[in-house]
Amino acid sequence: MFKIQNSVLFTILVLNFSLIVYPNNKTNDDKSNVIVGANQISKYENLLQDKRIGIVANHTSVIFRKDLGYTHLVDSLIKLDFDVTKIFAPEHGFRGTEPNGANIDDEIDIKTGLKIISLHGTNRKYGEIDDGDLKDIDILIFDIQDVGVRFYTHISTLHYVMEASARNDIPLIILDRPNPNAHYVDGP
């Protein structure tokens, strides 16, 4: 009798554990309830008022509204009359059009006229911000979708941005986005 009870208890524990550990891969509407940080400007706009803003962004830095579709975070902040001063672009560039490992030059964004500082150019560690580029910045925003794999440079870029922010005593807002590959974790 005792052996049967232990077997039943063990089976129940294994089933419960497997429900927790193994992901539920079916698609449901709950995923549409995720609201990314960029879509919640109203929650942090008081931190941006009367500040010169630097934005670390790329083509994934978008806001979605059912009535307007996709709008880039930079365009949205400018439309709301925030003082976006500079854009810092990671590997693949601000618009995401550059190939892997390309040395990208600084440029001017055609749409906004803002200076884009390449964080993946010559004479710099990939993702590193030069202190001189932060002289006219009061606050930094980081909004880049990561894909949850180790070899992507975006998480390293965030690391360097955090270091530069701390070194220059500049507040940093990190706008979170869900990891699209979060259901599967593997490796050493």
Q: For each predicted feature, which ranges?
A:
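Short acidic catalytic loops
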Residues: 138-147, 173-176
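Short internal beta-strands
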Residues: 83-92
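Glycine-rich, charge-decorated loop segments at or immediately adjacent to ligand/cofactor-binding or catalytic sites
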Residues: 95-101, 173-188
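A short helix->loop->beta-strand "cap" motif at the edges of active sites that frequently abuts
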Residues: 82, 167-171
